[in-house]
Amino acid sequence: GNPLFFWTLDALQWSNVDRIIVAVDLPYVDYINQYKFSKLDVYVRDPKNSRDESATEDVLIELIDSWNLDDDILLAQATSPLTRTKDYNKGIKMYSDYDSIVSVVRQKRFIWNDEGYPSNYNLFNRPRRQDFKGYLVENGAFYIGHSEHIKKWNNRVYGKIGLCEMDENSYLELDSEEDF
């Protein structure tokens, strides 16, 4: 089978993005390049931003500075393999109306707090799940913004934020062994 990152790159390859940049550690350059995606460029990240505790924003800003990027950036996460080309294209289309975009899913779950009280519904007027509007949750699949503002705010989202709603099954994120 294909590695986890393949599914994200494949969906991006067929999307409306002009260029795909993958930030990797040096030992993985040849491994990534063997997949021959025509839009693909590989960026070798600084070892200080290759640690498990490194923030995504640190890698983004490092890339922006190193390559002098002045462009719109779609940050896609390889840990969200169920993101489809149409999801990326939907976010790209929405972007013209917003400063930044975050992908989300609608959850229709009833949430309780640590004290034993419901957080998102009235205990004595519980809606049917089918009638429950639910709430939107980041699924971590992708974010869109401009390099200048990402750097200025040191954040992947800022300003007027658009929420790109995706199918509920895209909530899956594979960040740790427990997620498998």
Language model feature labels by segment:
Residues 18-20, 72, 99-100:
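Residues at the starts of beta-strands that form the adenosine-phosphate
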Residues 24-25, 77, 104-105:
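Short beta-strand/turn micro-motifs composed of small residues
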Residues 56-62, 69, 81-168:
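Conserved core of the sugar-phosphate nucleotidyltransferase
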